[in-house]
Every structure is written in C-alpha cells, then in structure tokens.
Amino acid sequence: MLLVVSTALCVVLLDGLLWLAHPLPSGQSARWIWKHDIAGVKQEVVFEKYHDLRGLSWTANSSLQKPPGTFRILIVGASTTESSQQEPKDAWWGLLEKRLQQQPELAGKAVQILAFGQGGFEVSDINTWLKHELHELNPDLLITLVGVNDVAFPEHSDSDLPGIYRLRGFLRKVSQIYRHASAIKLKWEVARGLAVKWITARDLKDLAGKLRALPLSEPASRNPDPLPRFVAGLHSIISLARNNGVPVLLLGQPVLWKDQVTPDEDSVRWFRHYEGSEASRASGAWMYHEMQRFNDAQRKAAAETGSCFLNLDEVIPKSLEVYYDDCHYTDAGSVEVAEAVFPAMFECLHRK
C-alpha cells in the first residue's frame, strides 16, 4: 500500500513539474516524407497529421480551437478521407480548401478544412470520434464520406473505442506525463514508418490475390444485414451535429464497382464482404448494387432530417484513371471528387 501511495505522489509531483517547466500542448503533430509506387499518385508524399487519437490532417497548421474569423469545415470518413497515399494539398479535401479560399464571398475570412479519416472506420466509429471532438473543433459545416467499410467489413468491432476515447481525452487534458509520452511515441512511430498505415503496389496485388482465393457468395439478402446499423449511425451523427448547431452534407460513397467491370478493373479489386464472420468474394456488379443500397439509405436519411446529400457514385467516373483499387482515388480522382463536392457544399451552406 505504501508503495502505491509513494508511486502516486511521485507521478503527481512529476506531472506538476512538467506543467511548470516544460508544458506541451494537447494534441501532438508530425510531418514526414514517404515514397511509394502506387500508380496514379505522386511518388513522394509529404504528410502531416495530428496524433493522440485526433487523427486530423490539414494543409496548414492551426490550433484545434477555431481562430476568430475562420470559416472551418470538418470532413470525416475512413481511408478515402485520410488519403494517406497523397499529400494533403493533393487530397480531394485539400483541393476543395484551395477552391474555397479563392471565393469572393469568403473574402476576409480564413478558410480551413480539417479532415479526419482512419482506414477501416465505419459510421459507428466516426460517430464515437465526433462525440469527443465535434464540440471542441466547432466547424461551420460537417461533411461525411462513409459507407464502403459498412458494406464490406461490418464485422469490425468498435466496442472498445468509447472507453479508450474517454480515457485518452481525460489524460490529454490533465496530464503532462501523458502528453510527453504521446510525443515520444509519435516520434518513434514516424521514425519506424508506423504513424500511418502505408500501402504499396505489391500490398495491393497481394490483397487482390487473397480476394480471388475466397469462395464466391452473392446472397440476395445478407444475414445479419449491416444496413440498419449503418442507418442508425448516420442518424446519430446528424443528431449530434444538429445539437451543436452544425449543418451536415452527406456524400454517397463513390466506388469503382459497376455492372460491367473490365478485366483490368477487376484485377485491382480486393474488398471482400462478410456474412457473419466468414469472408466471401463477390462480383463488381454485386458490390456495386450493395453500395447503391447504402447510398440510397444516405439519401433517405438526408431527406428525413433536412440535411444535404450528394451521391458521388452517380457523378464520379468509374475508371482506373480515377481509382487505383475498389474505392481509393488517384490524384486525378481527387480532382473529380473536389469538383463535384464544391457546388454541393455551397448549395448546402446557402440552404442553412
């Protein structure tokens, strides 16, 4: 018992000394260079990202608290928002920010887009993240790009996220020891190339090969059906945004999948789908119609709640010039997405 009390007192004293002598801000960031070989994107990426479970990316550094006179948009999603194979300025949201900064009606304001995405995240994961970050970030508009992981990987478990987020959120507010440990961990991850889940052309080829080895399954209905959980997550995000006075633009997920997939297009596919815990392979046509079902659910949720909606899958070309796999964008693809989102975003802001 004495050892426990002594250790606790030492921790408190050390934390107090760090607050006085060497305080670190909450939410560390890092910048590093990565080289890769994926077709359609630049071969050298300068990447910058917040650490400490915030996972935010940006084109120019900024405090988490919105500066006065700033027009801030928060974009949330999974890997197609994280855009880890691109520099922030080449990602679709970076291009969108550049367009916004050139608009006369926003003259005199600093325009900023913060993007949060993490590979594999589903709507429920994003909802959990927003519950802990939306109020502090205080955006003028929330844009979501979700759905493909809910279609393909609904067995992902996020049951531990709320507890982890609450604990880390508390520690980063009160503990300098935690902040210093986070900074050291981030530097170590950057040095070892672990700060982002990078992927190479060989990785993509291996993933595509693993898909071909799976049994073919194209059920008329899925059991369990992941759609109700997806819809519940959407409504939770919209309600959370409304409670914080933030309008929402839902983006339907664009994908390479379509009714007639060419052999070259089929060769880059690696997304599987799950029935229970069993992974299966399906044609591009089956995956396309499943994605349509989820995008239609987003359209319905937007109509029911008075939110804005744009189905990107109806306007983005389905070709290897735009995608380097099932759903991730080349540099040319990011241009297509930014050009499509720009007018829809302005229309949404004018509605609100």
Where are these regions (language model features)?
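Histidine-centered active-site loop/cap adjacent to the catalytic His
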Residues: 2, 230, 300, 305-308, ...
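Hydrophobic membrane-insertion alpha-helices, especially the h-region
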Residues: 2-17
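Membrane/wall-proximal cationic-aromatic binding patches
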Residues: 22-106, 318-320
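Conserved SGNH/GDSL esterase-like catalytic core that processes O-acyl groups on lipids
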Residues: 68, 72-75, 80-200
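Second-shell loop/turn segments in exported
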Residues: 79-87, 115-116, 220-227, 284-288, ...
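Extracytoplasmic/secreted envelope proteins and their assembly/folding machinery
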Residues: 93, 97, 127-131, 227, ...
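Serine-dependent acyl-ester chemistry module
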Residues: 149-299, 305, 317-320
